[in-house]
Amino acid sequence: MALKLPRAMIEDMIAHAREDLPNEACGVILGKDGVAQALHRARNAEASPYRYVIHPEDLLRFHRLVDEKDWQFLVIYHSHVASEAYPSPTDVRMSLWPGTNPPIDAYPDAHYVLVSLANRDRPVVRAFRITGGVVTEEALEAV
């Protein structure tokens, strides 16, 4: 089943990725029953072109919104500044709770969306599920 996101949210993720250059950008889309409700940009606590970590204060704010509005983490997004829109080994590792064996997904219901700016004029946006460390691409549909 395709991940359906408003075109404006896809454009906002691309804009965010460009604005945060030279570092990776990150954020979330919160929603209910698979329907996107709100995109929230986050600060990259790593401030790195090679890695992202959603700033803990931002993550806490997102969890509070999820609780207050009875939403879910629909999308966790980030950018790759010079590589393809595909989860890196670090991205896969970061999708899991540390030290769990077998692996436990940190956000089992979330889609992972990557924005590649490898070609600055033609950004690429792709969606994935990461389950137990296994990456599966999903169709992404702008609505």
PLM features: what roles do these ranges have?
Residues 1-73, 82-143:
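Conserved beta-strand-loop surface patch within small alpha/beta domains used
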Residues 79:
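Metallo-beta-lactamase
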